[in-house]
A protein has these predicted regions:
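N-terminal Rossmann-like NAD(P)+-binding domain of SDR-like oxidoreductases, especially those catalyzing
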Residues: 1-153, 312, 322
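C-terminal substrate-binding subdomain of Rossmann-fold SDR/epimerase-dehydratase oxidoreductases
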Residues: 3-4, 175-322
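Residue-level signature of the cytosolic catalytic core of signaling kinases
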Residues: 7, 20, 29, 33, ...
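Generic anion/oxyanion-binding catalytic loop in active/binding sites
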Residues: 26, 38, 50, 57, ...
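Residues that form or immediately flank small-molecule/cofactor binding pockets and catalytic motifs
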Residues: 31, 97, 115, 155, ...
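Residues in well-ordered alpha-helical elements
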Residues: 34-35, 47, 59, 66, ...
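Short acidic donor-binding/metal-coordinating loop in glycosyltransferase active sites
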Residues: 65, 97, 153, 159, ...
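NAD(P)-dependent short-chain dehydrogenase/reductase
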Residues: 104-109, 113, 121, 127-210, ...
């Protein structure tokens, strides 16, 4: 496995905690640097490419829209160009976001054929990333021995996320400091899921379409409808699971626009690939709290991480070939 990314953006960072630079072929490269990207592709000759690199935060995209578009749009152009010029690649998966859709605040989930038009610079840049991939597919990839898919995942949670302005990392930060968790949009609904759900799907899809191009396409990946909860509900679950007097309160939010209601219809992935979510949102919170407490109690976090991955993969065996 070869990974291309920037240096970890947080201290601490899961990449450093697990010493992944000692376990995989890790290249610290900006995906906007096409020449450096081409050199890695020339050397490695990859067969399966999964594109997850991004500026991933809505609030940061308001602060720095040019950088966001540069990374998320031109970065995708560069990845597509590397894929186009390397015949070794047989399977390509571009990971975007559930926020690519034109949000109409519907009470039902968006389907893969609904209109794309993200509102904020982050969401819109990811809509653009989809259009770039579609154009490259129509113009170039369709003439190659290459399967191309796009995946739109809901909000991910899990141990090891230390990013700012994300609900569960904020919950952990406030709680370990014995402070009340401040929630800016408690009534907003999001398709929260454990990070292992979409990541496993990307790997599974990359493998399946490598052997069967007919499976290539666009897929939503999110929780079952019963697990689409409000931010207030998921914070409440966190507090109930963490215990130790964990509590939260709503705070006034005067920041830039964020969607209030967002759900995904994942029927296509369930039907075409026999996929289904493994862990409920309650399970996801329990795993996240377990990981976080283990980390702050100075336990062997690599063992904890591997244990959770293996528990998940054992359950995944029911529908996959992993």
């Amino acid at each position: 496995v070869t990974g291309i990314a920037l240096k970890p953006a947080t201290i601490p960072a899961l990449f450093d905690i697990l010493k992944l630079d000692e376990k995989i072929d890790s290249r610290i490269i900006d995906i906007r640097d096409l020449d450096s990207m081409m050199k890695v592709f020339d050397e490695v000759q990859p067969e399966i490419v999964i594109h997850m690199a991004a500026q991933p935060l809505v609030i940061d995209s308001y602060k720095n829209p040019v950088y966001t578009y540069d990374v998320n749009v031109m970065g995708t152009v560069n990845i597509c160009e590397c894929v186009r010029t390397h015949s070794s690649v047989k399977s390509f998966v571009n990971v975007t976001t559930d926020k690519v859709y034109k949000n109409k605040e519907w009470v039902y989930g968006y389907r893969e054929n609904d209109r794309l038009n993200g509102y904020d610079p982050y969401s819109n840049s990811k809509s653009c990333s989809e259009l770039v991939t579609d154009s490259y597919t129509n113009s170039f990839f369709n003439t190659l021995d290459l399967a191309v898919s796009r995946c739109r995942a809901g909000n991910v949670i899990g141990g090891g996320d230390f990013s700012g302005n994300r609900i569960i990392p904020d919950c952990v930060k406030y709680t370990i400091n014995n402070e009340s968790i401040q929630v800016r949009n408690p009534n907003s609904t999001r398709p929260y899921q454990h990070v292992l759900e979409p990541v496993t799907f990307y790997l599974y899809l990359g493998m399946k379409q490598y052997n069967n191009k007919d499976l290539a396409g666009t897929y939503n990946i999110g929780p079952n409808e019963s697990d689409c909860v409000t931010t207030g509900q998921i914070v409440g679950l966190f507090c109930d699971t963490w215990k130790e007097d964990a509590n939260w309160s709503a705070t006034d939010y005067n920041g830039p626009h964020e969607a209030n209601f967002l759900k995904l219809d994942c029927s296509k992935a369930k039907s075409s690939l026999n996929w289904h979510p493994i862990w409920s949102v309650k399970d996801a919170i329990e795993k996240t709290v377990d990981w976080s407490k283990s980390y702050y109690n100075n336990e062997n976090i690599e063992e904890v991480t591997n244990k959770q991955i293996n528990e998940y993969l054992k359950e995944v065996e029911s529908w996959s070939q992993f």
